[in-house]
Amino acid sequence: MKKIQLFLLQFLLISITQHTNAQLPVKTEYTVEMGGTSGKGTYAPMWLTANRQGLSSANTENGYLRAGIAHTMPLNQHFGFSAGLDLATAYNFTSSFIIQQAYADLSYRWLNLSIGSKERLPELKNSKLSSGGMVESNNARPIPQIRLEVPDYVAIPGPHKWLHLKGHIAYGRFTDDKWQEHFTSIGNPYTIDVLYHSKSLFAKVGNKEHFPVEFEGGIQMSAQFGGDQYIAGQKEPVIDMPTRFVDFMRVLVPMAGDDTTPEGEQVNIYGNHVGSWNFAATAYLNRWKVKIYYEHYFDDHSQMFFQYGRWKDGHIGLEITFPKNRFIDTFVYEGLGTKDQTGPMLYDSFWGKFEEQISAKDNYYNHYLYQGWQHWGMGIGNPLLPGPIYNKNGQITFISNRVLAHHIGFCGSPCQSLSYRMLLSYSRHWGTYDNPLNEIKKQFNSLFEVTYAPQQLKGWSFTVSGAMDRGNLLGNNYGGMLVIRKQGIIKSGNK
């Protein structure tokens, strides 16, 4: 892990010294949006809620009004600045006023420093059609953070520029303290003042101008740390996690906690860490583009490498981009498996009589101290593992993380002003190893969406969506959604 961190630092230095920043025009853009959902059932259909950057609601009747502004400008040949503010007021959401985005970015050549809350998309996947990333997707609200990043691939000097790198390091804070206090039922735990950390390093090998196949691969890791755990109904915290400088280092380079942390942190790693290895190969075949990808999720060291043999859990995908036609633009198929989790047994020699360690029963997305890998009730990872927002028992956990699922998404543009999108998902759920469901639950989720952007009304778009859930996990739900959006440029030109 230390070698990965040193390599990332060297890469950032290379990106600063070897590349120049493109001169961007001064631009100020605005967006005003209104959306409403109406449905029948226990919840709003999943695909009317999932992968919408957390600006959504599981309630059958809900709506929002949103307004945002973004400004971009160059400071000189190498420096650039951008900032944005995106606010919403909502009905039947987890909060009635939402600061969706509030950020300021300072870029130097290809290096970017981002401060604040900003919407981001999963790595290597089609955010419009994919079911989402395993570690972080676009399912939950953005987490405010300080982020040092190379957001786009940077070519490393060499013949034909075959090697490209990108990556980031970030620290932030979760913002759902009040929601957790309100949602958690008496006697159940919740944790507030929780801090956030993430990092990634990705490489791309190839140059499609010289060879029609490119390969991508990388690692991303995120963590929850710090914070105070409470039991609902009690005033004093039961666990107070330290947040000293050394603790920030312990999540940067994952290490065990000291005697100021609970025993679980001393035996394992300080904080709740999640991560994944990501691989993709993209072929450019005349006017076709075909990508295959694989994301291997790990919740601890047992699945980070090959300690317990071959990887059995993962997220595989196929994405096909078609030559321009009226019927279909892009097709995505994905298969998801999280059922193994290294096996059903966990044994820590710290508390036992035997020296052997069995690091299984990984319990994806759940944690004894931070409850779940979630923000405002929505899972930060893949939404096919439903988040705590769906729990009736007032617990901030994932009730089913052992899942096998298939997912299909496709979209098209029959004409210049009309486009469509369709999502179809089928999943089977076993619950968790500790709390298995009394039977295998099956769930089907679907979405059909049409967007009309009339040429005579520049900047306006109207999106109508219909969705349906059928099954015995989330139930049978039906609903429709209407979104009206106006986008435009307030100012544009050279500095």
Predicted regions and their residues:
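Transmembrane beta-barrel strands of outer-membrane/channel proteins
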Residues: 28-41, 81-89, 106, 113-119, ...
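Extracytoplasmic loops and strand-loop junctions of Gram-negative outer membrane beta-barrel proteins
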Residues: 50-53, 86, 129-132, 182-187, ...
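Beta-barrel outer-membrane channel/assembly domains of diderm bacteria
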Residues: 20-120, 127-130, 134-153, 161-165, ...
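Sequence/structural signature of outer-membrane beta-barrel proteins
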Residues: 37-39, 86-92, 118-134, 155, ...
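Bacterial Sec-dependent N-terminal signal peptides
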Residues: 1-26, 492-495
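Short loop/turn motifs that connect adjacent beta-strands in outer-membrane beta-barrel proteins
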Residues: 23-28, 71-82, 94, 107-111, ...
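Internal, well-ordered domain-core segments that constitute the primary functional module
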Residues: 121-234
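Exposed, low-structure sequence patches enriched in small/polar residues
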Residues: 3-4, 213-223, 228-495
